[in-house]
Swiss-Prot record:
Gene3D superfamilies: Clp1, DNA binding domain, P-loop containing nucleotide triphosphate hydrolases, Pre-mRNA cleavage complex subunit Clp1, C-terminal domain. It comes from Drosophila melanogaster (Fruit fly). This is Protein CLP1 homolog. Pfam families: Clp1, CLP1_N, CLP1_P. CDD domains: SIMIBI.
Amino acid sequence: MSEDQGKDYTLESDSELRFEIEQKDAKVLVSLVSGFAELFGTELVKKKQYEFGVGAKVAIFTYQGCVLHVSGKMDVCYISKETPMVQYVNCHAALEQFRMEAEEKDRYGPVAMVVGPMDVGKSTLCRILLNYAVRVGRRPLYADLDVGQGSIAISGSVATILIERPANVEEGFAKTAPLVYHFGHKSPSGNSVLYNAVVSKMAEVTLQSLNSNKRTKSSGIIINTCGWVKGSGYAHLLHAAKAYGACAIFVLDQERLYNELLRDVPKGVHVVLLPKSGGVVERSKELRHEARDQRIKEYFYGNTRAPFYPFSFEVKFQDLRLYKIGAPPLPDSCMPIGMKAEDNKTKVVAVTPTPALIHHVLALSFAESVEDDVIGTNVAGFCCVTEVDMERQAVMLLSPQPRPLPPNALLLWSELQFMDNHT
C-alpha cells in the first residue's frame, strides 16, 4: 500500500498506536474510522482528520478497541499493548474521589504533583489527568514549574492556567490568560534562592485564586515539575510540595525518588509510584535546545494554523528600564550589616545595555518600579533584543505588541536567547 493512500490500524482494547516524526516537512494525517480512541486524554472525533508534524511523538490509546487510518511518513510506527494508561486512569479516579469530598465540604480540591527524572512523560501525565478532569465537568488549575521545557509559557518562567476544556489534539491546551512569573534561567540551579521565591509566590497567588470560584476550588491543581530530582533539585521538589500543600505526589519511573519522598513528606501525603510509558522518548541536549527555540518562535510568530505577525521597533537606551534579578555573589563579610550572601540572589540590579544583550529574551513586568515587589509580580509578556546600536544608543526589540513600550515599562533580563531568523 502506498504512503499516500495510508493504512488502517486495528487496535484491540487497552492498546495504543505509537508513532514518531523526525523528518522536517514531514506530516502525518490520522483519522478515527470506528470505535473510540484518545490522545493523552482528549477524545478523537470520528472521521475528523488530525495533522502532526516534525517532532511529534504520538500515542493514541483505546479502552474499547478502534480502527485508525494513518497516512504520511513516520520514522517509527507500532501498536503496543504494554501501556500504563489503566494505572493513570486509576490516579484520575482517586483524585476525583478527593474532588467529590471537597465539593461536599466546600474545601480545596486535591493538589497533585507529578515528579520524576527527565524524559519519563511528566507533562504528558499532567495533560492526561487534566483532560480527564475536564471531561467530568471539573475546572482544574495547571501549574508548570519546569523552567527548562515549559508547556504554558516560554522557558525561564513558571506559569499557571485554568483548564476549562480538553486539550486540542494537535496543539495542546489553550494558553488563555496565563499567570506567568519570570525566573530568567533554564534550570533552577541558575539561581536556587530565586526559584524557590518565585514558586512560593505563584503557589500563594494560585491557592488564593481558588477561593474566587467554587468549581475550580474543588477541582484542585495539577503541578508539573522539573526533571532535576537529586541534591538541590530534590530540595526544590520538597519546597514546592510544601508551598502548594500537595496531597498527592505521582512519581514516574524512579523508585529511589519514591522512597525518598515517602521518608520526607508529611504522613498525610499520598506518594504513588507509576511506570512510565514505553512510548516515552529520550531527548538529547540538542533536541531540548531546539524545543526551547521552537516555543519562543511560536510565542512571537505563532504556527502554520494560527500565524502571528510581531512588531520590530527601536528603543533608546535612555528609555530602557532594564534590570536583572540576582547580583554576583559576595562573601558574608562583605555584605551590609543584617544581610546574608543569599539576599544578593534576589537583588534587583540595573543592566547597562551593551552588544552582549543581543538575542536575549526580556520579560515585561507588571511592576512599575524597582521599589515594587519585582520578584512577586507577574509578567505581561516577552520581547527579544534583535539589535544593539552603541553609536545611536538604541536597541531594536521584537515584540508581540506595537510600539511604544507601556509607560514605566520595567524589563527583566533572561539568559534565554533567540536568534530571530524568521523570513
